[in-house]
Structure formats: structure tokens, C-alpha cells
A protein has these predicted regions:
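PLD/PLD-like phosphodiesterase catalytic module centered on the HKD motif
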Residues: 1-277
Length: 277
């Protein structure tokens, strides 16, 4: 299923239908509709213990507020607003490279230009405990691309058996222009979107067929044995991302790092020619 974003103001119903299918078909509202339609049908309350945290991986982050972020994650979580009953750290993981991830990549710090993070957007107190590494020390899976600078954007939530409840890959970065925001204006509640984006939403229920076979979407980890009905989803990072360690520094293209990359640079804007004799 396609998840588009298109600039505009979209009306929000004063009293949404029981299954919320009268919400706008753009941004995070489209994902919310899909989850409610296919994964948690109307008036059913899923057991929150059966689902892992929401994982968000992106290559840029906007100037988001904690209020917007909570609205965003409650829309994308299978648990809905009940996800906010727990701490944010338990509810969501943000995959964002460390300085070491970028510095040790094949391009070094200059490659971090494709992950343009501004410190004013990254160093917000409510976000800091949520960051997880791009690289992984827990697996030697050949599809992991820890030596390559990420530009992909992925969002998903796992079931308790490590299969995907749903998965989205697209162009949406973590920002209000890309995903949209609710606005209470002179014409009532509207949903404002400022950017053109496109994503693909997948869940096992979308693979149903006339034989009513059951399907699972599972990550490729190099060890999993295929079962009938398994649909493999390749991820270039570990599907259980690791939180930053005590000494990990988050990546920002505005920062200089003490450890040089393989080219002798210390930052994304270092000029290689200036390092030559």
C-alpha cells in the first residue's frame, strides 16, 4: 500500500468513524488508517506485550517538538495512544548513526553529508535516550551495511516472535513537513503537510489470498529457517538496534570528532586537499 505525502491542508473529522477510515490519506494519518484497518480492527485492543517498540530510521530530522513526536508515535504504534503510558525510551527507538559509524564508513566523515543532522534538532532532551546505532556488533550478517553511510528511511514494529507487525520504507524523514501535523485553526482541525514524499507500507494481512493462507514478514538475519508463508524483509542494520553506549557521540555534520577517519578528516566539511603535504 502506498503512503504519500502531498502539500496541503486536509480536513480532520470532528467525530472520526469507529475505524478512523475517514482520516486523510496522507502522511502519518495514512499509516494510522492502515494499522487500524488491517492489524487492529475497530474496537479491538491488542495486547501491548505482544509488540516491540516502534523503530524509526531516517537520514534527517526536523525541528520536532515532544508534543508532535508523541502524536506521531501513537499514530504509528499498534498500541495507539496506550503506547504513551510507558516511557518514550520503552516505546520507540531512533536509528541514527554515531560519529564512529560515519567516521569508519567507506567514505569517512564526508559521507555524512547524506545524513544532515543539525545539533539543534538532535540534542533535544526527550530524544537523547532514544538514539540507537546504525552499526551492530551482534551479527555478521552480510546484508548489514554498517560500512556504508545510510540514506534509506524505514519504520516498523515487531511482534513478540520477531516477525514484523508492519513495515514501511520510503522517502519520509522524521519531520513535520514530511509526515504532517494536526493544526487547530480558524476552520477547525486540519492536517497540514508541506512536502512531497512516498512510501510503501507492508503488513502480513495485505498478502492474504483466496486460500486464506497465513503469512509472516520476517527480517533476514542469516540464521532464520524459512517456514511456509514467510516473506523476508532485508534490513541493512540489525532489527533490534542497540542503544548508544556511554561514550558514543551522535553524528552531526556540524561537529568535529577527535578520532580521524581513514582519510585524516575530523568533520564532514574538512577539505582533503588541505591535509596533503
Amino acid at each position: 500500500m502506498l503512503v504519500p505525502s502531498a502539500p496541503g491542508y486536509y480536513d480532520l473529522p470532528k467525530s472520526p468513524s469507529p475505524n478512523f477510515q475517514d482520516l486523510p490519506d496522507f502522511g502519518y494519518m495514512k499509516v494510522k488508517k492502515a494499522i487500524l484497518k488491517y492489524i487492529t480492527p475497530s474496537k479491538q485492543k491488542p495486547d501491548t506485550s505482544k509488540y516491540g517498540p516502534l523503530v524509526c530510521q531516517f537520514s534527517s530530522i526536523g525541528g520536532i517538538s515532544e508534543k508532535w513526536f508523541k502524536s506521531f508515535i501513537s499514530s504509528l504504534s499498534v498500541s495507539g495512544e496506550r503506547v504513551l503510558h510507558n516511557s518514550l525510551e520503552a516505546a520507540v527507538r531512533l536509528v541514527w548513526p554515531t560519529g564512529e559509524d560515519i567516521g569508519s564508513s567507506v567514505e569517512g566523515y564526508v559521507g555524512g553529508g547524506s545524513v544532515p543532522g543539525y545539533l539543534k534538532n538532535l540534542e533535544k532532551p526527550f530524544l537523547k535516550p532514544l538514539f540507537c546505532k546504525w552499526s551492530s556488533s551482534t551479527s555478521k550478517n552480510p546484508i548489514f551495511k554498517s560500512q556504508n553511510v545510510p540514506h534509506i528511511k524505514t519504520y516498523y514494529q515487531l511482534n513478540d516472535d520477531d516477525s514484523f507487525a508492519w513495515f514501511l520504507v520510503g522517502s519520509h524523514n522524521l519531520s513535520k513537513p514530511a509526515w504532517g501535523q494536526e493544526i487547530n485553526g480558524q476552520y477547525g482541525m486540519t492536517f497540514k503537510v508541506c512536502a512531497w514524499e512516498l512510501g510503501v507500507f507492508l503488513c502480513p494481512e495485505l498478502y492474504s489470498n483466496q486460500n486464506e493462507e497465513s503469512f509472516r514478514m520476517v527480517p533476514v538475519d542469516g540464521t532464520r529457517k524459512e517456514r511456509p508463508g514467510d516473506i523476508f524483509i532485508p534490513l541493512p542494520y540489525h532489527y533490534h538496534p542497540q542503544h548508544y553506549g556511554k561514550f558514543d557521540e551522535l553524528w552531526s555534520w556540524e561537529k568535529r570528532y577527535a578520532k580521524p577517519d581513514r582519510f585524516g578528516r575530523h568533520a564532514a566539511n574538512d577539505n582533503l586537499l588541505s591535509l596533503l603535504p
